[in-house]
């Protein structure tokens, strides 16, 4: 498929994650362990956006008593390989996506050939037993491959994300724009001074961008480039001058300048997400094998330490002004941004040489992208499931007070549910046939984590899972699969922030909640 045809096909999603995000998705390879309904729904929502390839690993045969809700199983496929049946139908959604299937138990594959997973960009798993799950997680983390483990039973669903770390330059928060109103650079100051705003007629004044108006007033208020403009006298004088302009020219740009004047009195400060990255040990003490993100973060810290500012993005907001004035101002901001990129590039190349690495290892495009998006950088660390499952290691659970609105009982119910199945096999009726045994396992589990006082509310959730008899409801699995796919795309494209780290859905009351466990 040609580039233009591809962009037309994926037009809507490219608007969300742009061409670079789409390219990352198209290069990705996704593996699904166990082709149950929720797993197939997750894959469906990844195949449609155009992942590069997918693999289904499953040794079970189609059983309509359990697979009847799966839209990717046909009525004449009873007893056939579930991996082959689902993989072939899933591929029909997007023939450009390559497909493979493996008729083998995921647990056996993890035990005998765990290296198989090294070729994937992300692994999706459901219904894995605890021991192979932990082993797979450890292997994937060592290869920097995200793992998404999930389940859907009856009216409830759960998702857990595990990855060694998540770094992005496109976290997409609602950050204030970096316009440097309080700290204009010489070229911007000279441009503002070149215009005689005080002697302009109202028509000419109405064409001036509010940025120019604000800096002009600041320079009048405080000749030292508004360095003392936090003082009450300066603020009062600023408001007085703005009122004079309003009286002279009652236009929208003057109103914009007044409504945005607070930005002129705000001290330059690192956003919390940037501060966390620049003070992270991985940034401060980079190593020869440090990833590109941390090398550039280290260089960003050097840039900030020297200039007391981050590189300028060069982006301007929409403003009420003439096109000619807007373009002139845009050129000044763009030139400043380009100069900051060149300065940042020097730091990157010097650092790479110091680490005995090639200066070509980080491309000019990567440097430019990082520099212009540095306000959006973010790092997230994820606790391992193995750590989470240790009875004494989870401070979130230990300090929890479960109220009527909390979905923590559902999380605990899923943990106990999996424990019972692991002890008594995957025959649901057999595993939950003895109520006394179920109660005993639940009490023991809650006692280990100090939450035995919440037995009643947790046991109610367990009974709801039992009532499903191991079956999935398509509407619930479709929803959970959509969430899994959404979070997977974030991880693949390295855009936006994935949930950290557990998502729980209660379909009975249509409620969701996330926990950092």
UniProtKB/Swiss-Prot annotation:
Key words of the record: ATP-binding, Cytoplasm, Nucleotide-binding, Nucleus, Ubl conjugation pathway
GO cellular component: cytoplasm; cytosol; nucleus
GO MF, one example: ATP hydrolysis activity
Pfam families recorded: ThiF (PF00899)
Protein name, as recorded: NEDD8-activating enzyme E1 regulatory subunit
The protein's role, per its UniProt record: Regulatory subunit of the dimeric uba3-ula1 E1 enzyme. E1 activates NEDD8/ubl1 by first adenylating its C-terminal glycine residue with ATP, thereafter linking this residue to the side chain of the catalytic cysteine, yielding a NEDD8-UBA3 thioester and free AMP. E1 finally transfers NEDD8 to the catalytic cysteine of ubc12.
An individual GO BP term: protein neddylation
Subunit structure: Heterodimer of uba3 and ula1. The complex binds NEDD8/ubl1 and ubc12.
Family: Belongs to the ubiquitin-activating E1 family. ULA1 subfamily.
Highest rank taxon of the organism: Eukaryota
Keyword Transcription: no
Location in or out of the cell: Cytoplasm; Nucleus
InterPro entries named among the record's database cross-references: APP-BP1, ThiF/MoeB/HesA, ThiF_NAD_FAD-bd, Ubiquitin-activating_enz
Pathway annotation: Protein modification; protein neddylation
Organism: Schizosaccharomyces pombe (strain 972 / ATCC 24843)
